[in-house]
C-alpha cells in the first residue's frame, strides 16, 4: 500500500465524522527502510498461499525456533537482539549492505520475554519466565551472569542511562531497580497489579498494569508514584510508548485501539484515541508501539500482521504497509531510525 491519508479521529469527533480525510504529508515520512524481520520457524505446508514477506523486508537467519517476544537494537551500533519463547537470546549484526550476520546467543531455562541494552551498547539484559535477570557482556565475549531476579516472570526491562540503573517489571507486582555492582536490587517498588508494559523517556517512566492502570514515575524521585492514570482504553493493556518529550505516553490494547495521553492535567484536551489493526468486524491486538528516534512519528504493529506509521501531532496515518499473513509480535527502530525491525510468528 502507499500513503494512507486517513485521519485519526479524536475522542471529540470520533462518532461525528468517522470518515474524515486530510491530505497526506510525505515530508513527515522518515527514511524507514530497510525493515528487518526475525521470523519464527514454521511449517511451509501449513502457511497457505499467502506471501510470507509482502513488503520484501530483509530476513535474519537463522530464525528463532519459536515466537519472538522482544526486539532491541544497540544504542551504538546496528546489533539486533531478539528474545524468544524457545528460551534463547540471539544477536545479529545488520551490515551496511543489509545482510544480517548471526553473532552470538545465550540461553535461559524458560521462555525469554524481554530485553534491553546498557547505554554504551556493550551489555545485554534479558528476563523471562525463569524469573532471572541475565546480564550478558556481549561485546567483550564474556559469559552471562544472573541478578537475583523476581518471584514471578519478568515482563519488561529498561536501562536508565542517567542513573546507571536497570529497571525490571514483573508479574510479581513489583518494579526492581538494579545497580549492576550488586546482585540484589537497589530498590523494590510495589505495583497495584502485574506489570504488563513499561516505557521510559527519562525522567518519565510509564508502567502499564493488569488492572488497566498506567503508573507514572518521575525517576528523579523513583520511590514515589508521580501519578496513577486509568487507561483511556476499555480493555487489557498490551504496550506503551513514552513520548520523546516526556509529556505523555501512547497505550495500545487488545481491542485494536491506541490512546494518546498527556500526563499534565492542563493538557487533557489534547488526549484522544483511535482505532487501528482492524478489518471489518475483525479486531486485532496492538502488540507494539515505537517512536522514531529522530522524527518522533511512531509505529504500531499488531496481530493482523500489519504495521503502520503515524503522526500524533497532525493526527495522520503516514504509511500503511502490506499485511503479513501472521501476527507481528514486536517491533523496534534502530538508534538513528534508519531501520525498523519487526517479528512475525507462524503457527507450527
Q: Predicted segments — roles?
A:
Residues 71-77, 115-121, 157-163, 191, ...:
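Loop/turn segments within WD40 beta-propeller blades
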Residues 83-86, 126-130, 162, 168-172, ...:
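Conserved strand-to-loop turn within each blade of WD40 beta-propeller repeats
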Amino acid at each position: 500500500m502507499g500513503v494512507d491519508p486517513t485521519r485519526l479521529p479524536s475522542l471529540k469527533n470520533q462518532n461525528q465524522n468517522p470518515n474524515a480525510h486530510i491530505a497526506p504529508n510525505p515530508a513527515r515520512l522518515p527514511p524507514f527502510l530497510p525493515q528487518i524481520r526475525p521470523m519464527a520457524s514454521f511449517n511451509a505446508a501449513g502457511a497457505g498461499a499467502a506471501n510470507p514477506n509482502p513488503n520484501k523486508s530483509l530476513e535474519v537467519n537463522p530464525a528463532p525456533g519459536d515466537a519472538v517476544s522482544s526486539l532491541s537494537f544497540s544504542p551504538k551500533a546496528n546489533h539486533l537482539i531478539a528474545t524468544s519463547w524457545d528460551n534463547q537470546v540471539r544477536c545479529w549484526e545488520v551490515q551496511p549492505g543489509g545482510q544480517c550476520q548471526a553473532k552470538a546467543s545465550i540461553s535461559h531455562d524458560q521462555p525469554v520475554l524481554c530485553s534491553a541494552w546498557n547505554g554504551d551498547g556493550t551489555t545485554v539484559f534479558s528476563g523471562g519466565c525463569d524469573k532471572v535477570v541475565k546480564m550478558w557482556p556481549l561485546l567483550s565475549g564474556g559469559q552471562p551472569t544472573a541478578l537475583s531476579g523476581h518471584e514471578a516472570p519478568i515482563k519488561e526491562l529498561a536501562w536508565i542511562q542517567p542513573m546507571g540503573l536497570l529497571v525490571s517489571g514483573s508479574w510479581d507486582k513489583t518494579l526492581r531497580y538494579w545497580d549492576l555492582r550488586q546482585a540484589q536490587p537497589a530498590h523494590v517498588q510495589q505495583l497495584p497489579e502485574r506489570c504488563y508494559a513499561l516505557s521510559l523517556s527519562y525522567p518519565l517512566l510509564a508502567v502499564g498494569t493488569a488492572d488497566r492502570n498506567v503508573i507514572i514515575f518521575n525517576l528523579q524521585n523513583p520511590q514515589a508514584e508521580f501519578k496513577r492514570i486509568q487507561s483511556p482504553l476499555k480493555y487489557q493493556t498490551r504496550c506503551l510508548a513514552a513520548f520523546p518529550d516526556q509529556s505523555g505516553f501512547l497505550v495500545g490494547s487488545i481491542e485494536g485501539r491506541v490512546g494518546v495521553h498527556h500526563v499534565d492535567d492542563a493538557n487533557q484536551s489534547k488526549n484522544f484515541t483511535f482505532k487501528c489493526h482492524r478489518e471489518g468486524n475483525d479486531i486485532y491486538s496492538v502488540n507494539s508501539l515505537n517512536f522514531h528516534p529522530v522524527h518522533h512519528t511512531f509505529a504500531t504493529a499488531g496481530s493482523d500482521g500489519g504495521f503502520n506509521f503515524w503522526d500524533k501531532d497532525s493526527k495522520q496515518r503516514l504509511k500503511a504497509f502490506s499485511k503479513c499473513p501472521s501476527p507481528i509480535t514486536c517491533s523496534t527502530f534502530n538508534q538513528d531510525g534508519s531501520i525498523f525491525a519487526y517479528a512475525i510468528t507462524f503457527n507450527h
